[in-house]
């Protein structure tokens, strides 16, 4: 795809540093070399050069790199200035470059967008670039790099190959009606559909798992009022994040705090006490707490060991019975110093750990720390083969839905025309993942989240 303008942007964060990089992509690159470097450049060679302004005054000295289209990241001519990392120098360089006709400042993610539009990368790989930059754990970096290498895209393309194969086969059969009632053909279609449905189902499971384990671990601290939830968050974060009082219902909103354990970013959420309330604001807080309980990875369900009425079996059973496949609970009984008990761990409901401790007296804290270490170690040990996003999961679900419904309806009425339409829609949603079937709105939404210079 040919663009008639040239884009320029800092590729490094603006600030004082050893090196500052300016990236330029487009048809005006050769003019910029001639005007501001005044040297002849071979592609993919590093040149130590002086950088001049429009009046031939020296601005800086540094390294210049030139990449000739189409063998560049964007598929266009690319030039990079590696100057001293002074924001004044970078600003002067960019202002002078902008004097060249049809050169403008790049939008966020525009370099990656041009790479996508020039078929240098697909949409999954483009997203992976941004994910590498914003990753919050080594696991996320590893998964994003895998996506950048095309691991996820290859899996999608393999399914697409099989879908397109059966689609073309069905279209051919439709054009030869005498074969519609051939039992061998029907059996073959059914077999192929079942195989593809299994492929998508397996990939959807893998995608969902990777989405969970490639992201921050979300741990919700929940329980009745005044059991020590806010004290626990303050203890873990080593600062006063939540207000702690003896008044029930102090926490009404959800308090978020990201804390690093074992090389993993854990998002802890202090939530409103779960109880029946007439207070409108508190009710909203309780609804938010329940919402986060449903979407988190792990629940720290806290109780005051001295208040046995709070430990209601139905209350616990309701949370336990609604746990999702990848969720877990640790029960925490606080304030054991008030009943002269030593800290210990037991098992509740046959499989859930129950930790008895005192935050106030700093008793049993090692059990809690070991539990968090166990959670993060488990997270680190899961092999995340690629980085998954919500839109990938949504598209896979829709693709699978059309295929399952199409197969079921076809087996009832044997209308291949309707099955063909469902397969076409299934293909459409898979193509949306890699960006082969896209809308400008989708692209703008994705690339607007990128930083400037990527």
UniProtKB/Swiss-Prot annotation:
It is found in: Cytoplasm. (6S)-5-formyl-5,6,7,8-tetrahydrofolate binds at residues 23, 80, 120, 454. Residues 216-377 form the TrmE-type G domain. It holds the Pfam family MnmE_helical. Its cofactor is K(+). Keywords: Cytoplasm, GTP-binding, Hydrolase, Magnesium, Metal-binding, Nucleotide-binding, Potassium, tRNA processing. The keyword GTP-binding applies. It comes from the Bacteria. One of its GO terms (biological process) is tRNA methylation. InterPro entries: G_TrmE, GTP-bd, GTP-bd_TrmE_N, GTPase_MnmE, MnmE_dom2, MnmE_helical, P-loop_NTPase, Small_GTP-bd. Mg(2+) binds at residues 230, 251. Exhibits a very high intrinsic GTPase hydrolysis rate. Involved in the addition of a carboxymethylaminomethyl (cmnm) group at the wobble position (U34) of certain tRNAs, forming tRNA-cmnm(5)s(2)U34. Belongs to the TRAFAC class TrmE-Era-EngA-EngB-Septin-like GTPase superfamily. TrmE GTPase family. Homodimer. Heterotetramer of two MnmE and two MnmG subunits. This is tRNA modification GTPase MnmE. It comes from Buchnera aphidicola subsp. Cinara cedri (strain Cc). The gene is mnmE.
